[in-house]
Amino acid sequence: MIAWLLSSFFVLLFLGVPIAMSLGLSAIGGILFLGGGSTVTIAQRMFEGMNSFALLAIPLYTFAGFTMSKGGISKRLMDFCYSIVGHIYGGLAHVNVLSSMIFAGISGSAVADTAGVSGMFMPEMVRKGYSKNFTVAVTAISSTIGIIIPPSIPMVVIAGICGISTGKLFLGGIIPGILCGLAQMIVSYFMAKKEGVPKEPGHFTIGPVLHGLWESWPALLMPIIIVGTITMGIVSPTEAGVIAVVYGLFAGGIIYRELKWEDIKFAFAETVRTSGRIFIVIGAAKLYTVMLTTAGFDKWVAKTMLGFSTNPTVILIMILLIFFIVTMFMESIATLTLFMPILYPIALGVGIDPIVLSVLITVVIGVGLVTPPVGMCIYVACDLMDVTVGEVFPTLVPFIAATFICIALMVAFPQLILLPTYLMA
């Protein structure tokens, strides 16, 4: 049974069959032809995977992000970030990263950040003398902060699968997101020096910063509202998503008065497409995971890993490597839905903190989003600038290396993840 499930899935995947279809067909084949259970379980298990109140936050945060990006915040956000870091060598690259860090607190999606706010920087960066490869690389890698700094769609999925507090996960992602952003800025500085990019004119002054802060305060306030209301126990993550939607409509339509009815229809359509794809993958992955568990795959994985080592750090590194490798070939949501139910109990069994594990997995998944052959963010960024992944990837390697250094620091010092939770407690 295990051999069929794994071999049929990977054959379908490499033939180009969509991930949800590959998972579903492999699982259904096991049920129909190998006696893996009743056909009644197909619909039951798929519905069971999607039937989670916590997962309702996904379309809500997605819609809020689209409405904020369409409601006039993008240009104001760019100006605010430029007033802070634009004077540093490689200024536009730093603005790109800082904007992604702020937009991460709005959308919770790396791909949305790549195609949205970060995508707006690329033509301007090329016009100012940045190479296309550098421009695409910094845009793709900075967008991965979108799933680390709260709110985060992958964290919502993890919380729904493992029963972890979404609020604690959101708090755990704050320092790692900032750390990864600073690392990307350091790499951007030296790469800009190497490329001989002209330095932006002017120097840091407080006036433009205060003006930019006044213009962009509605966007800056949203992540504070979301994380604050959740961690204070006022609302659940899903209810906070409703607040984010109402606030996004209010900010774009009333405060900025730039959100049009066409923009709302676009945001709604994109939310339906994005959320529909995610939920279909979650349902199919749930069915596939149940079949793997029925076949004893989880016990085999646990026996193999614990037979190699019972040291928590070693097990943690092994789990992170598994997620990194798998995310290179599969969508992040499918990877989480498949492997979290299998690997999470192993991690708990050796004493790994669930918040530390979940945040580190989220960061690793972000690296997978910019790593070929299936890195979604790198392909979106390359399409926007009409370059190939092969051309961009060598420029991307230093950014990936910097992210792995950040991961190593977090593995060595998990307090970087847990500190906000301790402070709130």
What is each of the regions a protein language model found here?
Residues 1-425:
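Alpha-helical transmembrane segments of multi-pass membrane transport proteins
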